[in-house]
């Protein structure tokens, strides 16, 4: 299933990953007890035929602060918001907005877990609709490790019938 409207059901989950490049650019500024995080990353999209050959360019802003009792025991919490532009070429583009916060990821490590929504599409993706749960590396993990890490999206995507 490619997630077209007439084939899509609530149970259809389309999983894909953004393999984040090692040349991500982030800055960290102090603001009292918090740090303001901003920057961008790029990556190849893999794992879903509908999005095959796409590149993601994502921008984010957020803050990092000391965890308290309600923060699942994490010493430091990242709270991030961003926009990703997924492009096959200049004409076939998807825009998604997302937000996440430090939580326990699928593998038990600290990850930024949250939600995304597909807000705009052009070309092949005109009329796109849907949302996703996301699990992404923390900004500080990307800064420290300097390795490609995946951002995993579990999406429910629909497109209008193109007859």
Give each language-model segment a name.
Residues 6-163:
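Beta-strand-enriched cores of mature, soluble protein domains
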Residues 1-4:
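C-terminal segment of classical bacterial N-terminal signal peptides
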């Amino acid at each position: 299933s490619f997630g077209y409207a007439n084939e899509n059901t609530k149970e259809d989950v389309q999983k894909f990953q953004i393999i984040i490049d090692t040349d991500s650019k982030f800055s960290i500024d102090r603001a009292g007890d918090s740090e303001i995080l901003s920057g961008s990353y790029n990556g190849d999209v893999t794992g879903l035929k509908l999005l095959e050959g796409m590149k993601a360019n994502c921008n984010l802003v957020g803050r990092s602060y000391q965890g308290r009792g309600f923060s699942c025991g994490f010493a430091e919490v990242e709270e991030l918001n961003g926009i990703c532009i997924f492009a096959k070429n200049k004409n076939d583009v998807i825009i998604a907005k997302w937000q996440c916060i430090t939580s326990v990821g699928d593998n038990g490590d600290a990850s930024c877990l949250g939600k995304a929504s597909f807000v705009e599409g052009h070309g092949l993706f005109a009329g796109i609709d849907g949302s996703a749960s996301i699990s992404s590396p923390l900004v500080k993990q990307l800064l420290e490790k300097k390795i490609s890490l995946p951002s995993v999206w579990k999406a429910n995507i629909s497109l209008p019938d193109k007859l």
